[in-house]
Amino acid sequence: MSQKPVLVILGPTASGKTELAFRIARKTGGEIISADSRQIYRSMDIGTAKPPKWMLNEVKHHFIDEKEIGEPFSAGDFAEQAAERIRELRQRGITPIVAGGSTLYLEGLLKGFAELPQSNPEIRARLKHELELHGAEALYRRLEAFDPEQAKTLDPTKTQRLIRSLEIIEISGTTVTALQRKTSGPPPGIEFTVIALDLPREVLYERINRRTSEMMHAGLEAETRHLFDKFRDEWRSKKLNALATVGYRELFEHFEGLYNLETAEALIAQHTRNYAKRQLTFFRNRLDVEWVKGPLDEAGIEALVESLCEKIA
């Protein structure tokens, strides 16, 4: 008998993925494969909206608290290891449920990777020099002109992927978007059912605003202060990409004296809304998903849990 497909629950930040995946896993006796590139790091708890301890104790979550900040872990590492764990769980008769919103993690697992050209040190050095001279906005506008679809998925302030995208265009003569259409495919022997939670924009933004306030009340400032005291040199030299995460970046800048705490909180909410918009653009343009209405109340959650359990159990 052929195995049922693996359920993948994706959606923008604050859309309810964590709660939905937990309930399905609890009902089916399953385990959760977390596709979140920041929750994998220890000491980044409040700002990454990790599931609470009682959830982690009740249902096994993979790829949460498995790495120290600074340990390398790429989208390729995730795709390979997630496929291995899915196979292991199935061999033990356990239902795996993938849930998360990290775009490159999800794309790597579901579609595989495109063959991208190797980095060219001369081109990369020149682009970095142009970044220093003209700033990230100028390079972002250039990418918008050449590859608007890729630009929509990027945070203009995170320059590593911006430079890499422009480098690929110069080396290959084509865009990242065009190259990504030719991927290596999903892992052998695993089929996926991919659903994405769709919420009215005003509801999603209100959830983001409320969650930002809740994070601050839960101690995000103190959590970030601990990280700032430990990693301020790495932050200033931009050596740790994890520290550029929304929620931490703004508070690091507050500790550096760039603005007051109230402004930092407002920026966290604003930047999180921007991130959610980029996630939605990515899911719609780059992944093959079934959009479902995100539940707005308890009855809606229970109905969706029942419906999705039928697909996989």
Curated annotation (Swiss-Prot):
The record marks 102, 124 as: Interaction with substrate tRNA. The keyword Cell membrane does not apply. Substrate binds at residues 13-18. Its EC number is 2.5.1.75. Keywords: ATP-binding, Magnesium, Nucleotide-binding, Transferase, tRNA processing. It comes from the Bacteria. Its cofactor is Mg(2+). Residues 36-39, 160-164 are annotated as: Interaction with substrate tRNA. ATP binds at residues 11-18. It catalyses: adenosine(37) in tRNA + dimethylallyl diphosphate = N(6)-dimethylallyladenosine(37) in tRNA + diphosphate. One of its GO terms (molecular function) is tRNA dimethylallyltransferase activity. Pfam families: IPPT. NCBIfam families: miaA (TIGR00174). HAMAP family: IPP_trans. Catalyzes the transfer of a dimethylallyl group onto the adenine at position 37 in tRNAs that read codons beginning with uridine, leading to the formation of N6-(dimethylallyl)adenosine (i(6)A). This is tRNA dimethylallyltransferase. The gene is miaA.
